[in-house]
C-alpha cells in the first residue's frame, strides 16, 4: 500500500489549472481579462486560451480544442454546471455593483456565512465563477 501511495505522489506532479468549456474563446478572454482582471498568458484562436491570476491557470477550451472533443462513448463536453473556480476578492459588495453595471449575470444574491461572503456569477457561456471575500479573523 505504501508503495502505491508513493507511486501516485510521483505520478501527479502538481496542479496545472482548471479547464472551462466555452463556445467563443475570444469572448471568454475578454470577459476574464476585462471584467475580472485575469492575465492573458496564451491564445490560439479559435481553439483555446489560457488566463491566469497568481498560481491559478484557467484554460478556456473552445469547440475546436482537443480538450473539448467528445468522449469515446459520444458524451459531449458542454459549458455550465456547478463545479467552479473560486476567486478571492476584497470589498465583495463593491465588486458586485461594478460587475452589475457592466451587465454581468449573477446566479444568486450575495450569501454571508461564518467563512465569509460569496456570490456566483456566470461567464458568457454559463460557466459559474464564485467571488469570495473571506471573513475577517
Per-region residue spans from a language model:
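Vicinal oxygen chelate
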Residues: 1-16, 39-87, 96-122, 133-137
Amino acid at each position: 500500500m505504501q508503495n502505491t501511495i508513493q507511486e501516485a505522489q510521483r505520478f501527479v506532479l502538481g496542479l496545472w489549472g482548471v479547464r472551462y468549456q466555452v463556445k467563443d474563446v475570444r469572448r471568454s478572454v475578454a470577459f476574464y481579462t476585462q471584467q475580472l482582471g485575469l492575465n492573458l498568458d496564451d491564445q490560439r484562436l479559435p481553439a483555446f486560451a489560457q488566463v491566469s491570476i497568481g498560481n491559478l491557470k484557467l484554460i478556456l477550451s473552445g469547440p475546436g480544442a482537443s480538450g473539448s472533443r467528445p468522449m469515446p462513448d459520444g458524451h459531449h463536453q458542454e459549458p455550465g454546471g456547478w463545479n467552479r473556480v473560486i476567486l478571492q476578492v476584497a470589498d465583495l459588495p463593491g465588486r458586485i455593483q461594478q460587475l452589475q453595471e457592466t451587465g454581468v449575470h449573477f446566479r444568486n444574491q450575495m450569501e454571508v456565512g461564518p467563512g465569509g461572503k460569496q456570490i456566483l456569477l456566470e461567464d458568457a457561456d454559463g460557466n459559474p465563477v464564485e467571488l469570495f471575500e473571506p471573513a475577517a479573523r
